């Protein structure tokens, strides 16, 4: 059985901005999952940094990324991923919750996640 890869916004942004870890993210795209919360973060941050975002979500789908809606079943695990001082944003926690729900590996470039004390398989790219 293959473990699902769940992409954090930071991983996709690293790819778009050709930052360290971009090659690894590119290899993970086909079959990866991503919360629509994280997609929203990617679109906002990419536009903020001058990246053309028109149709970006469709480009990611064409590359094999499957977007998952953030719904009622996502709300509780996302809230439960919060802890005082963890520094995890809503987007971070949505990614972690999705990884937990599907038994997958959350992929991020945010090294702080390793110290957040979450019970999810993590892959920190840098």
Segment roles from a protein language model:
Residues 1-34, 46-58:
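Short, well-structured N-terminal submotif of metal-dependent ribonuclease cores
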Residues 2-4, 96-126:
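Acidic, PIN/NYN-like endoribonuclease modules and their adjacent C-terminal/linker elements
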Residues 7, 37, 109:
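Active-site flanking residues adjacent to catalytic metal/cofactor-binding acidic residues
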Residues 11-12, 38, 74, 94-95, ...:
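Alpha-helix capping/helix-boundary segments
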Residues 23-30, 46, 60-62, 85, ...:
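Alpha-helix C-terminal capping segments
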Residues 31-34, 63-66, 105:
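Short loop->beta-strand "edge-of-pocket" segments that line small-molecule binding or catalytic clefts
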């Amino acid at each position: 059985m293959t473990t699902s890869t769940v992409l954090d916004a930071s991983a996709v942004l690293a790819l778009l901005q050709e930052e360290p870890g971009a090659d690894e993210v590119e290899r993970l795209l086909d079959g990866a999952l991503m919360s629509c919360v994280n997609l929203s973060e990617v679109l906002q941050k990419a536009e903020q940094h001058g990246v053309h975002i028109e149709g970006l979500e469709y480009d990611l789908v064409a590359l094999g990324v499957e977007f998952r809606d953030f719904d009622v079943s996502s709300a509780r695990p996302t809230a439960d991923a919060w802890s005082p001082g963890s520094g995890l944003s809503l987007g971070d926690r949505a990614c972690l919750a999705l990884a937990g729900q599907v038994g997958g590996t959350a992929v991020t470039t945010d090294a702080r996640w390793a110290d957040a004390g979450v019970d999810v398989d993590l892959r920190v790219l840098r």
